[in-house]
Amino acid sequence: MNIKSALNRVVNQLDLTTDEMRDVMREIMTGQCTEAQIGAFLMGMRMKSETIDEIVGAVSVMRELASSVELKTLDGVVDIVGTGGDGANIFNVSTASAFVIAAAGCKVAKHGNRAVSGKSGSADLLEAAGVYLNLTPVQVARCIDSVGIGFMFAQSHHTAMKHTAGPRRELGLRTLFNMLGPLTNPAGVRHQIVGVFNQALCRPLAEVLLRLGSKHVLVVHSQDGLDEFSLAAPTFVAELKNGEVTEYWVQPEDLGIKSQSLYGLAVESPAVSLELIRDALGRRKTENGQKAAEMIVLNAGAALYAADHATSLKEGVALAHDALHTGLAREKLEELGAFTAVFKQENEA
């Protein structure tokens, strides 16, 4: 199916099959469509609402066209990522959590990008911390193998996305592509925490990942609107495990953490986010640093559970607490910066 035929279907509120969506996505991602066609298609899909079949088709093409990272094994390798767009401008919780996960002995294949609507994306934060971003897939794999964590810069691995940049920017609205990033990890991880901007997406995206071969995933959205586990409110979870999706709510207290307000956790820039994260990962913490540490432990613990490194969310949080408070997580942040600096010299020589 070509994009013109798809547009006729979509404007009449008719769904596409998975194969039809694959055809259209290949046209879009290989530069065969005009910007007007892409914009119209994305808007039509949003107004109709994307189905699980359509998202599966779109994700499969993006994965197919990505520059993949080949790892020795995917067993227990985890990603923690969010769609963004929650408007809260909280510090980079999932990126900070990744270093705690690695410090707990679990390998992390972190996928991320620069900020679109927020103040600090994962790439912005890591760059501020001295991490070199423009790595080859082989270099990313070496980071994961040696340091326990590697960062896959989305724009380097999904170069076909350049064809959608103009229409997405001009629309200025959330579209299908806001959902695709977290579902298209270039290492093909099967264990994930995926934060989403709308609770209604939790179960559908868990079902998408089930169809695409994921093993253990938690898709989350907090009652106070965050695309991660919140310290201040219950968090809704759609959990994919053992081939089934279950849904439930989690309070911080369920996991041994006291609920508290998010005041003091919003940031205005990557530099401010980094300062708060270094505070949280350090041995001596300010009041806001301690609060940030609790938020990090909550999310890192969930990821350790998703990686099957822990048998329950509560056990995962306990492991994350130990990894953070030993100072090992902060050491991992500095270690990744030093390790990637060697690759920078190689690549720019």
Swiss-Prot record:
Residues that hold Mg(2+) 1 according to the record: 94, 228
Signal peptide feature range: none
A matching Pfam family: Glycos_trans_3N
Positions annotated to bind 5-phospho-alpha-D-ribose 1-diphosphate: 82, 85-86, 92-95, 110-118, 122
Pathway connected to this protein: Amino-acid biosynthesis; L-tryptophan biosynthesis; L-tryptophan from chorismate: step 2/5
Known EC number: 2.4.2.18
Reactions catalysed: N-(5-phospho-beta-D-ribosyl)anthranilate + diphosphate = 5-phospho-alpha-D-ribose 1-diphosphate + anthranilate
Residue sites binding Mg(2+) 2 per the record: 227-228
Single Gene Ontology BP annotation: L-tryptophan biosynthetic process
Role according to the record: Catalyzes the transfer of the phosphoribosyl group of 5-phosphorylribose-1-pyrophosphate (PRPP) to anthranilate to yield N-(5'-phosphoribosyl)-anthranilate (PRA).
PANTHER family in alphabetical order: ANTHRANILATE PHOSPHORIBOSYLTRANSFERASE (PTHR43285:SF2)
Assembly: Homodimer.
Protein name: Anthranilate phosphoribosyltransferase
